[in-house]
Design a protein with these regions (language model features):
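Small-residue-rich segments of transmembrane alpha-helices in multi-pass membrane proteins
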Residues: 21-25, 76-79, 95, 140-156
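Multi-pass membrane catalytic core of lipid/isoprenoid biosynthesis enzymes
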Residues: 72-113
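Interhelical loop and helix-boundary elements at the membrane-water interface
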Residues: 3-16, 77-88, 125-144
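Alpha-helical transmembrane segments of integral membrane proteins
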Residues: 19, 39-47, 87-91, 95, ...
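Membrane-interface helix caps and helix-loop-helix hairpins in membrane proteins
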Residues: 104-110, 127-136, 153-160
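Membrane-embedded alpha-helical segments that form the functional core of polytopic membrane enzymes
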Residues: 22-26, 30-64, 100, 113, ...
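Alpha-helical transmembrane segments of multi-pass membrane proteins predominantly involved
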Residues: 2-9, 18, 22, 27-30, ...
Length: 161
């Protein structure tokens, strides 16, 4: 069981997710001048993390053929067969649904809309189009990675100031 949990966790790209969430969390603190509403902060943090993890899983689902021929990505759970594409898809949908529910119920629509737009951008536009479009693909694709400070801010404040 723990092997499976570990493999599902790997679908979220935890190294990248960790860095994204540091910036989201820091912006939550700064947006409230160190006076956080803990419910909004925790639900926003978890919701953003779940949706970001979902987009990482979608990226691995769509890229598994490419991942299988690269040394750096050749041991990912879908490539190795430890998790099926179907199971990974269900996991990604679950994370997207729970993350969305948390943000919509406890935070606000603006945060959800921005987070969902980031999910679409990374999971589909970057993964299927930009990645193969030329030398500036990573710069344009970096838009998704730059969103967490804004997402964290709006999760606790509700506006873009």
């Amino acid at each position: 069981m723990s092997l499976t949990i570990t493999e599902y966790f790997k679908l979220t790209k935890p190294g990248v997710l960790y860095l994204l969430m540091i910036t989201a969390g820091a912006s939550m603190v700064l947006a409230t001048n160190f006076n956080l509403n803990l419910v909004k902060a925790l639900t926003g943090f978890i919701g953003i993390a779940f949706i970001a993890g979902s987009s990482a899983a979608i990226n691995q689902i769509l890229d598994f053929k490419y991942d299988s021929v690269m040394e750096r990505t050749g041991k990912r759970p879908i490539v190795t067969g430890k998790i099926s594409i179907f199971s990974a898809t269900l996991f990604a949908i679950f994370l997207l649904f729970i993350g969305s529910a948390l943000i919509l119920y406890f935070n606000n629509f603006l945060t959800w809309a921005l987070t969902f737009a980031t999910w679409v951008f990374y999971a589909f536009i970057y993964t299927k189009i930009l990645k193969f479009s030329g030398v500036l693909n990573i710069v344009i694709g970096g838009l998704a990675g730059s969103m967490p400070p804004l997402l964290g801010w709006t999760a606790v404040v509700g506006t873009i100031d």
